[in-house]
């Protein structure tokens, strides 16, 4: 299954895409920077990102929750 779940702007020419994709028979969570190709408005994936097995979703959510907690405690959010 290849499905983009969320897309948000990183800057004027790049966006972050979060989704699920299949690679070599493995289902992966993919968080990746996509960039606009020069001279067009087509977006292409870059090597900047991370793919991980879908079974790591719980650990990923826990880590992001901890990051959010620390940022709030530090008054950064």
What are these regions (language model features)?
Residues 1-2, 17-22, 76:
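A generic short-segment signal for beta-strand/edge and adjacent turn/coil regions
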Residues 1-12:
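Negatively charged, low-complexity tracts enriched in Asp/Glu with abundant Ser/Thr
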